[in-house]
A protein has these predicted regions:
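N-terminal small-residue-enriched
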Residues: 1-470
């Protein structure tokens, strides 16, 4: 069925919902055509392609939510979902503590086309495999006998989402995302080191064609090799400078999740009750911006049909706002800001980040480190996790560089940092004019995965706990 046909069916379902006197109804069609493959040590470890399409319908009836979905494009199946959702809502209403309220937002009627040069759905799997093999072979050649493991992956997805609700919104959004990545583990005796590089954008297969091996697998291989001869990082408290990749990891894990308003209303965030107060150093601002062209985490409309926006979380140290759905905005008495996203048709929209970052400052990296007698520069952000309600976080860096007498010195390995979120951000003393937004990821929350990105400038912390070798 054509996109126009899907829109007409959604409008028809919306009209049926209105006949049944529900307070609110939202019908959302979603389809994805995707492919992916992964090589491991020269072998095809995973290859696949597929297409899924279906519809999910949410209703508010008697003050309660109901939801049902079907992997189908048949109107009869959609109508059955509507009836099931209404029945669920009315049963739930009998056990309701407080009725569902949704914030008002102007109705949107729009169609968004995907922007790309080479449609990945038209590129053969053989061509995709050849590109991935080229990346892996370049890394193997660079690493030689010190290779312990090579992994190279490619994924693409073409999405269509159509949102239609009883408030007059009818929004169709298309997007194409492509990702390629390489991870290499090197070994020298008992020492093993890992490095990885990722390129991911809202783009087609042209992303792969514009990414030479030396910028992806070659870069990862060079780092993994150099780390074999590096000494372990020292453990203790030090002044630390974060590379933009570590900055992105920190703001995503430590602030971004805490700023999701569903965590606020559930009492699971350290930012609860702190709106309008100082939560970071004066030099720190934090934004989540869904409007950046081509970025992995961007979108024109969220899964409730609300325009994506640039959302200010922290401005010059003051907590200004949170990421909201229609429901959380109503609960907190603020305007919605387009932060509700759903992973496919079978999931309900929940509050999610997009591109989360600290905006750049005015200092150079050289100026940032000039007064540090002994400290560390952390680069190559790899992973992190956060306990939202406790305000604790851990971030692991793929590489560290010692700072001695105001200058970059020797490379170190096996370094991580941990601390209390607000304490760390209060100890930021300077940020750089250099800026990167290159931490694309598929973030998991409540069983849903969503495209997000993160980044920022170099950030100087007065003192932080570094995990290494004592």
């Amino acid at each position: 069925m054509t996109k126009t046909g899907m829109q007409e069916q959604l409008e028809r379902l919306r009209d049926e919902a209105m006949k049944r006197k529900v307070e609110f109804a939202e019908a959302r069609f979603a389809s994805v055509t995707s492919s992916g493959l992964m090589l491991q040590d020269g072998r095809a470890d995973r290859m696949g392609a597929g297409k899924r399409a279906g519809m999910g319908v949410r209703v508010v009836a008697n003050g309660a939510w109901g939801f049902a979905s079907a992997e189908s494009t048949e109107f009869g199946d959609w109508f059955s979902c509507l009836e099931a959702a209404i029945e669920m809502a009315r049963v739930s209403a009998q056990r309701l503590d407080e009725p569902v309220l949704l914030a008002d937002v102007p109705a949107a009627v729009d169609e968004v086309q995907a922007e790309f040069e080479i449609d990945p759905t038209t590129v053969s799997i053989e061509r995709k495999l050849a590109a991935v093999q080229g990346y892996e072979e370049a890394s193997a050649l660079r690493v030689g006998e010190r290779v312990a493991n090579l992994m190279t992956g490619y994924n693409d997805a073409r999405h269509l989402e159509i949102v239609c609700n009883t408030r007059g919104t009818l929004v169709s959004s298309e997007s194409v995302r492509t990702m390629v990545w390489h991870a290499v583990t090197t070994q020298d005796g008992s020492i093993r080191q890992r490095a990885q590089e990722i390129r991911a954008q809202q783009a087609g297969f042209e992303l792969v064609e514009a990414t030479p091996a030396e910028e992806l697998s070659g870069k990862a291989a060079a780092l993994a090799l150099s780390l074999l001869s590096a000494q372990p990082a020292p453990a203790g408290k030090f002044p630390v400078v974060f590379h933009p990749s570590i900055t992105g990891l920190l703001v995503h894990e430590a602030i971004g999740h805490n700023a999701e308003a569903d965590h606020i209303v559930a009492g699971q965030s350290i930012l609860e009750g702190k709106a309008g107060t100082r939560v970071t150093a004066d030099c720190v601002s934090i934004v989540d911006d869904a409007t950046i062209p081509g970025s992995w985490g961007s979108y024109r409309y969220d899964s409730e049909g609300v325009p994506g926006q640039r959302r200010v979380i922290v401005e010059k140290g003051i907590l200004k706002g949170f990421l909201h759905s229609l429901e959380t905005a109503a609960k907190m008495g603020v305007a919605p800001n387009g932060s509700a996203r759903a992973d496919g048709f079978a999931n309900r929209p929940i509050v999610r980040m997009s591109n989360t970052m600290i905006p750049p400052g005015e200092m150079s990296l050289e100026e940032l480190i000039s007064d540090i007698d002994l400290g560390l520069l952390l680069r190559a952000g790899q992973w992190g996790y956060v306990w939202c309600e406790k305000g604790q976080y851990t971030c692991h860096a793929g590489e560290g560089v010692m700072i001695r007498n105001g200058e970059l010195a020797e490379q170190v390995r096996d370094v991580s940092v941990s601390g209390m979120t607000l304490e760390t951000l209060a100890n930021v003393s300077a940020i750089s004019s250099d800026f990167e937004l290159e931490m694309p990821n598929n973030c998991g929350k409540n069983g849903q995965r969503m495209a997000v990105n993160g980044g920022g400038p170099y950030v100087k912390i007065k003192e932080i706990v570094v995990g290494g070798q004592a």
